[in-house]
A protein has these predicted regions:
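Structured, basic alpha/beta domains of bacterial-type, RNA-associated proteins
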Residues: 2-17, 23-28, 32-117
Length: 117
């Protein structure tokens, strides 16, 4: 007998925001219903909020299209921001020196499950 899949995933990779700042945003929506999480993220002013919003919206669309689940029954069961590769380059400074610059990236993963009634 095959198990019924009731979880939808979405991943945003190489997002140009630091994982630390992204984790501050995702801690606010972990465990919420998907619709409520999207409403909360819509009004957050942080840059990572937009990337997290898009990833959760993508997971909701995956659940509706691929699994036929209702968006009202979905809960953010797992959400995480992992470190992506760092882009490094240098700016030239005074006296022949250079200043290294590092741009951090994140991989955002969202797992939605169906709410148990």
């Amino acid at each position: 007998m095959m198990a019924v899949i009731t979880e939808a995933r979405a991943t945003a990779r190489y997002v140009s925001v630091s994982p630390r700042k992204t984790r501050l945003v995702i801690d606010q929506v972990r465990g919420l219903q998907a619709e409520k999480a999207l409403a909360v993220l819509k009004f957050l002013p942080n840059k990572p909020a937009e990337a997290v919003y898009k990833t959760i919206a993508s997971a909701v669309a995956n659940a509706e299209e691929n699994l036929g689940l209702s968006r009202n029954d979905l809960v953010v069961s797992e959400i995480r921001a992992d470190e992506g590769p760092r882009r490094q380059w240098r700016r030239f400074g005074a006296r022949g020196r250079f200043k290294p610059i590092t741009r951090k990236t994140s991989h955002i993963t969202v797992v939605l499950t169906e709410k148990v009634s």
